[in-house]
UniProtKB/Swiss-Prot annotation:
Pathway(s) this gene product operates in, as recorded in its UniProt entry: Pyrimidine metabolism; UMP biosynthesis via de novo pathway; UMP from orotate: step 1/2
Name of the protein in question: Orotate phosphoribosyltransferase
GO molecular function: magnesium ion binding; orotate phosphoribosyltransferase activity
Binding site for orotate: 133, 161
Keyword Magnesium in annotation: yes
Assembly and binders: Homodimer.
Name of encoding gene: pyrE
Catalyzed chemical reaction(s): orotidine 5'-phosphate + diphosphate = orotate + 5-phospho-alpha-D-ribose 1-diphosphate
Binding-site positions, 5-phospho-alpha-D-ribose 1-diphosphate: 103-104, 107, 129-137
Source organism superkingdom: Archaea
Classification via PANTHER family: OROTATE PHOSPHORIBOSYLTRANSFERASE, URIDINE 5'-MONOPHOSPHATE SYNTHASE
Lineage of producing organism: Archaea, Methanobacteriati, Methanobacteriota, Stenosarchaea group, Methanomicrobia
Origin species: Methanosarcina acetivorans (strain ATCC 35395 / DSM 2834 / JCM 12185 / C2A)
Family classification: Belongs to the purine/pyrimidine phosphoribosyltransferase family. PyrE subfamily.
Length: 187
């Protein structure tokens, strides 16, 4: 999606390098034996919670994601609990767009809603995700948002592990826009 990316290849590369340095500096990239939420085994782990709780790194993520959001023609920034919430909140603050939080399941008390924030059928949203592997969590969130009549065409992820999320989201008529890929990060 050329319209949602910064203007030049050099600018994109500069932004990637800035984010990669920040992710490594805050300890978000770890090596060892890990089991991912998808159930897959991995020799590395991207702990974006480290990044989203570090003000400097979160600000870099928010600024870079906001540049892309501004070109997407959306009116709401959404995040899936838990990992997407601080990211979407920061991007909401950076862009001035309203925030929507999508719960993974209906809560059994209070409003019993899967959503925190206003959601109308005419809304156009971008979803924020911390790390994408298979894209399963965000696909589920897109489905429940679309059931309300709202439109989700884009998902911005901080790191795409390049393990099928892009293709799965394309099948769901949504475009994955990674700030960096695992290949970028592990070079």
């Amino acid at each position: 999606m050329s319209q949602s990316k910064p203007d030049t290849g050099n600018e994109i590369e500069t932004q990637k390098q800035e984010l990669i340095a920040a992710l490594k500096a805050c300890g978000a990239v770890r090596y060892g034996d890990f089991t991912l939420s998808s159930g897959k085994k991995s020799k590395y782990y991207i702990d974006i919670k480290k990044a989203s709780t570090d003000p400097k790194t979160l600000k870099i993520i928010a600024r870079q994601a906001a540049l892309r959001v501004k070109e997407m023609g959306v009116g709401t920034v959404a995040g899936v609990e838990l990992g997407g919430v601080p990211l979407a909140t920061a991007v909401s603050l950076e862009t001035g767009l309203p925030l929507l939080i999508v719960r993974k399941s209906v809560k059994e008390y209070g409003t019993k809603s899967r959503f925190v924030g206003d959601l109308r059928p005419e809304d156009r949203l971008v979803m924020l995700e911390d790390v994408t592997t298979s894209g399963g969590s965000v696909r589920d969130a897109i489905k429940v948002v679309r059931e309300t009549g709202a439109c989700v065409k884009y998902v911005i992820t901080v790191v795409d592990r390049e393990e099928g999320a892009k293709e799965k989201l394309k099948e769901a008529d949504a475009e994955l826009v990674p700030l960096v890929t695992a290949s970028d990060l592990l070079k």
